[in-house]
């Protein structure tokens, strides 16, 4: 079920050489390390969190810890591409989101088994996610 759609953004540290640009292209990103978040060894490409993850990169770092992504962004001038939503508690004051010029849309949603009912905690979680919808 789709919660909302969003245009991809490039997350990078506020002092990154590309940080002052109003928009960033994939070509602009070539010299910098790309960070890909993976949730497990057998993660399906159909449920990848990053758009453009299949586009070749000269330098790519795969991480499974969100804190590590922030540390790599701060220490290596690395970047990741995501929805534009970034929690402040993950060093958010030092990380910025710049729109990506590519003509793509991310669809943010969830999958549940149709034979099961969503728990109360699950409903609360989805209500919290909806607060991030870029309306």
Where are the model-predicted features located?
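Beta-alpha-beta core module
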Residues: 1-2, 6-7, 67-115
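Structural motif corresponding to alpha-helix initiation and N-cap regions
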Residues: 23, 63-66
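Extended ligand-binding regions for polar small-molecule ligands
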Residues: 27, 31, 107, 111-135
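Short helix-loop capping/hinge motifs at secondary-structure junctions, enriched
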Residues: 15-24, 102-104, 115-121
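Flexible hinge/capping segments at coil-to-helix
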Residues: 1-34
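Secondary-structure junction motif
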Residues: 26, 31-55, 118-122
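Short secondary-structure boundary segments
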Residues: 14, 41, 83-86
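A local structural motif
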Residues: 51-60, 94-95
């Amino acid at each position: 079920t789709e919660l909302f759609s969003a245009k991809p953004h490039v997350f990078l540290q506020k002092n990154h050489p590309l940080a002052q640009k109003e928009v960033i292209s994939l070509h602009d990103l070539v010299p910098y390390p790309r960070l890909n978040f993976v949730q497990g060894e057998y993660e399906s490409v159909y449920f990848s969190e990053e758009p453009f993850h299949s586009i070749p990169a000269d330098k790519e770092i795969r991480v499974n810890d969100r804190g590590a992504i922030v540390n790599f962004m701060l220490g290596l001038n690395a970047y990741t591409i995501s929805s534009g939503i970034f929690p402040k508690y993950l060093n958010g004051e030092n990380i910025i989101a710049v729109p990506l010029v590519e003509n793509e849309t991310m669809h943010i949603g969830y999958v549940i088994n149709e034979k099961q009912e969503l728990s109360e905690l699950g409903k609360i979680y989805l209500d919290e996610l909806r607060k991030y919808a870029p309306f």
